[in-house]
Amino acid sequence: MALFSSQAQAFNQTRQTYLARELALANTHWTRLRGLLGTSRSDFRNGCGLWIVPCRGVHTLAMRFAIDVVYLDRAQAVVHIEQDLRPWRFAPVRLQAASVLELPCQTIAGTGTAVGDKIEISLGKDARRQLD
């Protein structure tokens, strides 16, 4: 199960709105492979998210709920979005993506997030150490 932290957040600078106020980081082989597997829909509530680095595509195999997916380039600009990706599906691989945000359904629609938006990822000190 992903460990969501209120110290790590994803903020849409273009729309001036939060995509995730509690963000988990998946940046090792194991955490990227596991992703949200084992996370319940009630644990993955509005305001939560998973940032997968590096990542160019995702799947929802063995998941029990749908998600929204935001693909980010190296500058953390949105290059593609997938809304309501249902369980047992593959999202397209986007070669221009450097990372992906997995979010609860309706996050993209609720925030108005669109291709070209700039996303700021702020990490707590523990998460920053994991990226180094």
What are these regions (language model features)?
Residues M1-D132:
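Compact, glycine-rich, soluble single-domain proteins
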